[in-house]
Every structure is written in structure tokens, then in C-alpha cells.
Amino acid sequence: MKFSNISIAALFTILASTAMAAPAADSPDSIVAREPAPVEETYEAPSGLEKRGFGCPGSEKKCHNHCKSVKGYKGGYCDGPYIPFVGRPRCKCY
């Protein structure tokens, strides 16, 4: 199949026009079109939430003493496994 000079020129023109239609990677138009970088959120726990472990994990005596101070309970223990970034033992009162 032999291409004529006109078909080669038309093909070249189409390819050149599509290359010019897309903005360059670092042009101001492409930078504006990008989404802004995500802002890192910081979370500060309220003062009451920091104290809710009652010694779990690590000090079951704090948990036991906490439960003894609650009316109707004889004591307490740390219940559940410690899984990093997922969960930690909680103070269970009996």
C-alpha cells in the first residue's frame, strides 16, 4: 500500500495539531488544573479522653483500683489483646 504525499501531509498535520492541543506538563494551565495538596490534619484529644485507659495495658492495679472506686463493683482487670494501631485492652469491672 503506497501512501500519497497528500495522505502523509494530512497525517502529519493531524498528529501535530493534537500534540499542540494538550498543555505541557509544567504549564500554568496544567498546574491550576491539579488538585491542591492535602492538608495534614492534627487531632488533639480532649483532656478527658486521655485518661480513659485506667492503666490498660501495663498496670492492672490502676484498673482494679478504678473499678473498686465505682459503686457496685469489687474490682477489675484488663480484658482483650493489644493490637498496634487497631485496639488495646480495656478495663473490665466485675
From Swiss-Prot:
Role:
Antibacterial peptide potently active against Gram-positive bacteria. May act by selectively inhibiting peptidoglycan biosynthesis through complex formation with the cell wall precursor lipid II (1:1 molar ratio) thus inhibiting cell wall synthesis. Shows remarkably activity against resistant isolates such as methicillin-resistant Staphylococcus aureus (MRSA) and vancomycin-resistant Enterococci (VRE) at the concentration of micromolar level. Does not act by destroying the membrane integrity, which is consistent with its nonamphiphilic architecture. Acts more rapidly than vancomycin.
Domain notes for this protein? Has the structural arrangement of an alpha-helix connected to a beta-sheet by disulfide bonds (CSalpha/beta).
The UniProt entry's GO biological process terms, in alphabetical order, are: defense response to bacterium; immune system process
Extract the signal peptide range.
Answer: 1-25
Residues bound to beta-D-GlcNAc-(1->4)-Mur2Ac(oyl-L-Ala-gamma-D-Glu-L-Lys-D-Ala-D-Ala)-di-trans,octa-cis-undecaprenyl diphosphate are F54, G55, C56, H66, C91
A Pfam family assignment: Defensin_2
PROSITE patterns reported for this sequence: INVERT_DEFENSINS
User: What is a single cellular component term in the Gene Ontology annotation?
Assistant: extracellular region
The entry's localization annotation reads: Secreted; Target cell membrane
Sorted alphabetically, which keywords does the UniProt record give?
Antibiotic, Antimicrobial, Cleavage on pair of basic residues, Defensin, Disulfide bond, Immunity, Innate immunity, Lipid-binding, Membrane, Secreted, Signal, Target cell membrane, Target membrane
Propiece residue ranges: 26-56
Please verify whether the record's keywords include Cell membrane: no
Family to which this protein belongs:
Belongs to the invertebrate defensin family.
Main site of residence? secreted
Which InterPro entries does the protein's record reference?
A: Defensin_invertebrate/fungal (IPR001542), Scorpion_toxin-like_sf (IPR036574)
Q: What is this protein called?
A: Fungal defensin scedosporisin-2
Q: Which GO terms describe its molecular function?
A: lipid binding
Q: Which cysteines are joined by disulfide bonds?
A: C56-C78, C63-C91, C67-C93
